[in-house]
Amino acid sequence: MKIGVFLPISGRATGPETLTQAAQSAEQQGFDSIWSADRVVTPWQINTFYPYSENHEFIVPPDRPFLDSFTCLAFLAGCTEKIMLGISVLVLPYRHPLYWARVAVSIDRLSKGRLIMGVGVGWMEEEFAALGVPFKERGKMTDEQLEIVEKLWSEEHISYEGQFYSIQDVAFHPKPIQRIPIWIGGEGMAAMRRTAKYGDAWFPYYIDITAAQLRERFDTIRRMAAEAGRNPDQIQLACCRAIEVTRDAVPQEETRLRGTPEQLIEALNAYREAGVDHIALQFMVPRWPDRVEQIERFASEVMPHVR
């Protein structure tokens, strides 16, 4: 099982020194990937149901600095050598596919084939409104974008006619070094169907799920893929999970990753046994220095035992 760690691309301590240290340390410690999140703008008033916290309220203050995910990964491509560079996840309707496909290929080539494209439809209706993008059409827009990008990265004369995008006989060069993996974010049935049709991996971020439940839902995706004529073995199971390393043993819940190194080894091995190919971990510690300490403990005391 490969293991990734989220980067500090938001917060007042964020800057080139912190990012460089975080990425280079992760590479030296043996992590397989580093991850950035996506945000364009944060409205002051947010009423949309937030799916990634227990009280369903968005936990990031509107005035918290938030760096662009693509820019951070391009910067870190030159500061690292082998670690994979991932986005979790790019909200596709926020950008035209011709634009982000170009940026993605540029990062892939500058990093010598290390980019992972986590993609999703987005959730914050207020952010869609600020960008002038129709919230209710985000799923259809995402599907069209995935079809377009597949053409851009593989064909010479690219044309596409859809409900939202129209492209007539354009060239797109250079092509990516690798076949840039598309990891589909999202937890609902629509995201599962999208993974079965377009994805190289399913990449959900659940706050409350067991490894066995995750596997059960992935098996549903595999069945959908087979019904669509795809080889299910071409789709990987990946996931994002929040994690906390504690000093003392705590009561264990199958739906949480929280505990001592020994407890986390047992919990993460359940994910490995469930067939998870890659897990991206978000260490839930507010202050970056404290997070550094947790990441170091995890890398030395947990990671060697859960590969």
Walk through the language-model features, giving the residues of each.
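Active-site-adjacent structural elements that line small-molecule/cofactor binding pockets in enzymes
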Residues: 1-307
